């Protein structure tokens, strides 16, 4: 039996054993898919977290990284790159003129493995490609039922196919573990029903699925900048009692709900003592992220205000603003919260942060407020 490769001199996790059924050719590259425009910030995060990786190909919506020699991460490797929708082991590309049998070429590259699902998605969501037809052909080639659900189950070994162009596909694989790794391309499969009042409903729906936010019926939540009420609508559906804070009008479908209250004013005009008793503070305001943090900090600085969690969308006026992300996360920790962040597939140039109360006592930030507030 040949000697095992020497341990990699890297901080990357390394698989100590190969899970049964995994591909023999595990691939020497990582492919990370992301929003168009987020590539540089994804790479910035990679340098901070995994500097041993070496950047390879760069396309709008996808970046590849070469693994160090001897490094073989676990099958479910999904580092916290924030801007990565999904992360797969890349086996390379297949390319052929239009009309050629790319499916056969893709299956040859994939090789034999205990595949349980197939994920197909376009690198460019605007591209005129039929991902469903391609997936059906790949399933047939693997002897799998064509009606197999596109979403994988945790533990499934997934064959990945990212459509770069109609003539070129990227082939790879991963083992599903996190919610996003169960969705093709890391794109949330949920749809927004016609009775929802704004896209904020869908973003919060994805956040709940991504972070497993522990909302519970009977809890109280307030939303800063609530109009027209999409997030409030989703909170109400989760069984919470909701206060929406916004001088603008709330959609009647939300405003008429018996568990909804509208404070028709700006959040900074609310007396701080009124925030006592809320379990959750939610914010998706279209303002600078520093201003969002100031609004939240003003609230958590108040004695007696200690929500169990914060769900905040941090807008990025420019992608480069994300370089301040480590400082923003430090701010949450200084408040006594443990933050998790991710750029949601249903959002735009923004990141979503779930910050849960840590349970440890911390010094309160000072808040500047007018007398009587």
Feature-to-residue mapping (PLM):
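SAM-dependent transferase fold signal centered on methyltransferase-like domains
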Residues: 1-373
């Amino acid at each position: 039996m040949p000697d095992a490769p020497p341990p990699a001199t890297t901080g990357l996790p390394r698989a100590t054993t190969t899970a049964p059924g995994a591909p023999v050719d595990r691939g020497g590259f990582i492919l990370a898919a992301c929003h168009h425009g987020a590539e540089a910030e994804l790479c910035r995060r990679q340098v901070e977290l995994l500097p041993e990786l070496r950047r390879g190909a760069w396309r709008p919506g996808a970046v590849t990284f070469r693994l160090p020699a001897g490094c073989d991460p676990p099958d479910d490797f999904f580092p916290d790159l924030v801007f990565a929708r999904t992360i797969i082991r890349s086996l390379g590309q297949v390319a052929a003129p239009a009309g050629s049998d790319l499916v056969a070429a893709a299956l040859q590259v994939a090789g034999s493995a205990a595949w349980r699902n197939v994920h197909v998605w376009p690198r460019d969501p605007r591209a005129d490609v039929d991902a469903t037809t391609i997936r059906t052909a790949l399933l047939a080639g693997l002897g799998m039922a064509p009606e197999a659900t596109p979403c994988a189950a945790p533990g499934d070994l997934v064959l990945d196919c990212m459509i770069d162009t109609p003539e070129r596909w990227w082939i790879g694989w991963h083992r599903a573990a996190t919610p996003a790794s169960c969705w093709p391309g890391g794109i949330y499969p949920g749809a927004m029903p016609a009775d929802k009042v704004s896209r904020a409903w869908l973003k919060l729906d994805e956040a709940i699925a991504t972070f497993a936010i522990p909302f519970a019926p009977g809890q109280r939540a307030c939303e800063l900048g609530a109009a027209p009420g999409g997030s409030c609508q989703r909170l109400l559906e989760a069984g919470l009692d909701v206060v929406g804070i916004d001088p603008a009008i709330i959609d009647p479908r939300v405003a008429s709900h018996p568990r909804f209250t509208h404070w028709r004013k700006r959040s900074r005009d609310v007396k701080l003592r009124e925030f006592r008793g809320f379990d959750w503070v939610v914010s998706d305001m279209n303002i600078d992220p520093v201003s969002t943090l100031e609004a939240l900090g003003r609230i958590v600085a108040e004695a007696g205000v200690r929500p169990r969690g914060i769900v905040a969308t941090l807008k990025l006026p420019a992608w480069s603003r994300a370089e301040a992300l480590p400082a923003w996360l430090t701010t949450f920790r200084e408040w006594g919260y443990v933050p998790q962040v991710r750029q949601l597939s249903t959002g735009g140039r923004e990141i979503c942060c779930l910050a849960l109360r840590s349970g440890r006592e911390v010094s309160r930030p000072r808040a500047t407020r007018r007398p009587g507030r």
